[in-house]
Amino acid sequence: MAFPPLSRVIHPSFTGFTDRDLPCVYVASFDGGIQVPASHLIGGTAQSQWHYDQAVQAIERIRDGYALAIPGIADNLACGLWLDNGVYYFDVSTSFHDVADALDFGRDNNQISVYDSESGGTIAVLK
């Protein structure tokens, strides 16, 4: 089971958003994540017209798009948001009980590594 290309999920997710909203999301990385420069979220978001409610709607629509695109995965999706070097990253992920399954899934989806929640570290995905 592989995550579909984000372009197949994100486009319907942004129905109803204006062209003004899309540049601040700057659509996405190829691994299923969204990157939003932190400067767009400072000072009431006047710089980008990106508002909290719109961000929540976008996250919910992307999550729901993946849930529809991958049968049986809806109950195992997680959404994460973190700040690194002035950029907020949003990513959809799924979890596994078995490390081998996680590594296989990561390999199938061209991931560099998987996160091990038990150790708090990452494990390289070897090709």
Which residue stretches match the model-derived regions?
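Conserved, structured core segments of small domains
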Residues: M1-K127
